[in-house]
Amino acid sequence: MYKRQVDEFEKAIAQSQIIMFPGGFSAGDEPDGSAKFFATAFRNAKMKEAVEKLLNERDGLALGICNGFQALIKLGLVPYGEIRQQDAQSPTLTYNTINRHISKMVYTKVVSNKSPWLAQAKLGQTYCNPASHGEGRFVAPKEWLDKLFENGQVATQYVD
């Protein structure tokens, strides 16, 4: 990234309380889509420092929708809480088990409300939500899954 753009982003993050990574078929919705771009851009030392200050020193929030959630995972912000490289054991999003894109209404159940985003949600409450993705399957080793549930980092689960 150009120095001026990095400086502008750094300044904007320093003045923010929330950083939001959007989705919406950006980057042609290629595998990992815009998540690859976000992961590359935000690994810049200045950008990384700005995000980590936002989250750790100013109690800021991060949100990722669709490809934006992939970006949070690729950056390491989920589940590590810091920008870092992934390794073979890192959680990831991958292709749906049916090997094609889905677009339908799904039911999810709140299993943790520790996040400020869900502070008012009732545990066990079920919601009907639109879902549209080709890479919506979260994969992690069992020990990671157990840890994520134990820490309350899994907010919702699909239900029938």
Each model region followed by its residue ranges:
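Amide-donor transfer/coupling interface in amidating biosynthetic enzymes
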Residues: R4-Q15, K48-L55, R84-D160
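Fold-independent oxyanion-binding glycine-rich loops
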Residues: P22-G24, I65-G68, L75, V111-N113, ...
